[in-house]
Amino acid sequence: MIQVFIVDDSAVVRQVLTQILNKDPEIEIIGFASDPIFASEKLSSVWPDVFILDIEMPRMDGISFLKKIMSEKPTPVIICSSLAEKESETAVLAMKLGAVDIIEKPKVGLKNFLEESEILFIDSVRAASNARVKTHSFQNDDSKFLENHKQPKTDFSKIDTTDKLIAIGTSTGGTQALEFILTQLNIHCPGIVIVQHMPEKFTEAFANRLNQVCKIQVKEAKDGDRVQLGSAYIAPGNKHMEIYLSGAQFHIRVLDGPLVNRHRPSVDTLFHSVAKAAGKNAKGIIMTGMGNDGANGLLKMKQSGAHTIAQDEASCVVFGMPKEAILKGAVNTILPLSKIVGEVQYF
């Protein structure tokens, strides 16, 4: 039984989430509170397997409560937040602090959204219950070789086009894993294209924050972007991203379309396009996340001559996507996160 505690100042959210999650016989709501102060009082006698947490609440904000949870008893936390710009940035910070998922909460039509998103919430709770949220101490085996000598940030208008391409797909736990990798790269690394399952607007905030802490350039991808050395492009939320070859240059196509594996952006969509556009000049990496998105596309990349890598179980928050790719025969190499850094830098 997966025990869940809901902390949200909206009575509608607390009521409807309780109703839809209770439909799953494996999920039990053991408590809820309108703010973290009330939650703390109730948590003296019970402790859940998963928290669902709002960000903006009276008396104590969600980030402060998240820090309290992670310091006292690290537990999987799902952020359920609106898409206001300020909250988007805060939600990205929550992921850095250990939250395992973000679910977009609209400001209008909230009750209908919650009822229509029953499968989304149940799947998220199930995935979160399997997540490892203790602080990881990733010992980077390639650190001596990745000294970046405080090199200047990439200038998109001047840098050369990449002739190699790194494609990364990830979901639950991916924000921390991506930050671990990207912050250690220097501006001579190949161009990188990334699908991180994340709602619209959160991807922009995530890319902007990474850009502030990385030596390479990190941005939310735009339709028509030319993929360049020393740069990483994150697929925008609620859009698919594909790569195509124009002359000798890789370009990005951002497009609408139906959900693929219940996701938009989809890792499979990206990987299939990279297989076609780059072939053996690409490297595909599937990392921590729930579900099977990316497994078919990674197999197509492998068949096209690309080298394919899966993050190992020990360093994953959720060993779902890598496991599915391995079982499908799509993976050449299984590596801990600490070894993936060098695979990206030195391709």
Curated annotation (Swiss-Prot):
Active site: 171, 197, 293
Catalytic reaction(s) noted: [protein]-L-glutamate 5-O-methyl ester + H2O = L-glutamyl-[protein] + methanol + H(+); L-glutaminyl-[protein] + H2O = L-glutamyl-[protein] + NH4(+)
Keyword Amino-acid biosynthesis assigned: no
Every CheB-type methylesterase domain range: 159-347
Listed GO biological process terms: chemotaxis
Broad class of where this protein is predominantly found: cytoplasm
Superkingdom of the organism of origin: Bacteria
Domain Response regulatory residue range list: 3-120
Subcellular location: Cytoplasm
Family to which this protein belongs: Belongs to the CheB family.
The record's note on its domains: Contains a C-terminal catalytic domain, and an N-terminal region which modulates catalytic activity.
Protein name in the entry: Protein-glutamate methylesterase/protein-glutamine glutaminase 3
